[in-house]
Curated annotation (Swiss-Prot):
Positions of the UniProt region annotated as Disordered: 335-403
Cysteine pairs bridged by disulfides in the record: none
Record's subcellular location: Nucleus, Nucleolus
InterPro entries: WD40/YVTN_repeat-like_dom_sf, WD40_repeat_dom_sf, WD40_rpt, WDR55_POC1
Similarity remark: Belongs to the WD repeat WDR55 family.
Protein name: WD repeat-containing protein JIP5
Protein encoded by which gene: JIP5
Record's keyword terms, sorted: Nucleus, Repeat, WD repeat
WD repeats: 9-48, 59-98, 105-144, 200-248, 306-343
Phylogenetic placement of the source organism: Eukaryota, Fungi, Dikarya, Ascomycota, Pezizomycotina
SMART domains in the record: WD40
Compositionally biased tracts (Acidic residues): 337-350, 360-375
Any one GO cellular component localisation term in the record: nucleolus
Length: 403
């Protein structure tokens, strides 16, 4: 069972969220164009710790729509409605390189999605439906111009999910990916281009995640399966290699008598440490997070991120804690202690309290003061992300009930 450890308030609506692959770092991009990076507390048994802001800046004029870490976590990339892609240091926020997004004719073509496919390849999708392939240099810097351009869908790309590399792969990195956009799913190869495109699903396909093995058809359990979230609240299942049409449907937030279907806006595979490795966490338009067991084809657990705003981003950090984002809030979730563990911790705390009273020492804890501050700037006018709508940010946020 997952429980909410803490809630991190934001100064503007969340448009993008990225998690460092190896360190407890969370970076958020806001509707105001600001980008903030926070250090999450380590996963200690006592649960004590602080969320600390490492740096913040107004990275883009307009909104920051996309954020992604490089494969090794040494580079961070952002893209905004100013039609600029920036590469910067995750620890300091210092910009190292930047490029302009190609125009669509004489008009700007703002970003819709970004994904680091390999250490040498960055994928960038735009509002016009273009999908650009960008080369990355040895230090993670951006190449001046895209090396390829594809149009896999009639609308903008809503999700990108790499397919597992083949057994013949020498690099160990994927060269193919599944994308969704409009009402279709497509498969693209970094060299060969668009390889497959599904039939019209007559429903908006919004997000996707892959289960590498364990869910394929009989006698092919090792075959990968892609789960796709839709605008009607239904999760569709696709077998690798059978890209014409979906194979199964799971009703998560719509269908089968549900009054108001809610969109499934984001999805992530739940780590095997939380179960069988065949579950996904889905962010829903009504502000809930659903844990879906794909093997049993059912919703296992529903959590509440927000009462009003939908969940627009979801992921797991390096300690397998779930991070959900939406509206002006980010929440951190972790496995709840079992009753036996909780009772044991209470006993330990009682004993420690009595010992402190006996010792009567006068030691004091040193506290770090963060004097970093961002410039006072008026927030930019909110820009809609993907054609839909939005006091200073505190430097440290404590877990509820803890020092």
């Amino acid at each position: 069972m997952l429980e909410n450890l803490c809630t991190l308030p934001l100064s503007a609506d969340l448009f993008a969220q990225a998690l460092h692959p190896e360190k407890p770092l969370l970076t958020v991009g806001l509707s105001s164009g600001h980008v903030h990076t926070f250090s999450l507390p380590p996963a200690k048994k006592d649960g004590k710790g602080l969320i600390k802001e490492i740096w913040s800046t107004r990275r883009h004029k307009g909104s920051c729509r996309c954020l992604v870490y490089g494969h090794d976590g040494k580079a961070l990339y952002s893209a905004g409605t100013d039609c600029i892609v920036k590469h910067f240091d995750p620890e300091t926020g210092k910009v190292k390189s930047k490029i302009n997004i190609p125009k669509r004719g004489n008009h700007d073509d703002p970003p819709a999605i970004m994904h680091a496919l390999t250490p040498k390849t960055l994928l960038l999708g735009t509002d016009s439906g273009a999908l650009y392939i960008l080369d990355l240099l040895k230090d993670g810097s951006l190449s001046p111009e895209p090396v390829r351009k594809h149009m896999p869908h009639d609308d903008y790309v809503t999700s990108i999910t790499p397919l597992p590399p083949s057994a013949e792969s020498t690099s160990g990195f994927s060269k193919q990916w599944v994308s969704t956009g409009g009402s279709t799913l497509a498969v693209t190869d970094v060299r060969s281009g668009i390889m497959a495109r599904s039939e019209d699903q007559e429903d908006e396909l919004l997000c996707s995640a892959i289960i590498p093995s364990g869910l394929g058809p009989k006698k092919m359990r090792g075959n990968a399966v892609v789960a796709v979230g839709t605008g009607s609240g239904v999760l569709t299942m696709w077998d690798r290699g059978s890209w014409d049409d979906q194979q199964e449907r799971i009703y998560v937030a719509g269908g089968r008598g549900k009054k108001e279907p809610e969109s499934l806006d984001c999805i992530v595979r739940v780590p095997a440490s939380h179960g069988s490795g065949t579950k996904v966490a889905v962010g829903v338009g009504d502000g809930s997070v659903c844990i879906v067991d794909l093997r049993r084809r059912e919703v296992e657990l529903t959590l509440r991120h927000d009462e009003v705003e939908g969940v627009t981003a979801i992921g797991f950090d390096c300690y397998d804690r779930m991070i959900s984002g939406g509206g002006k809030v980010v929440k951190v979730w972790a496995e709840a202690d079992s009753p036996e563990e909780a009772e044991s911790e209470d006993d330990d705390e009682d004993g420690s309290s009595k010992k402190r009273q006996r010792d009567d020492d006068d030691d004091s804890d040193d506290s770090d003061s963060d004097d970093d501050s961002s410039e006072d700037e008026k927030p930019a006018k909110s820009n809609s992300k993907r054609r839909k709508g939005k006091g200073p940010l505190p430097g440290t946020i404590a877990f509820p009930g803890l020092d």
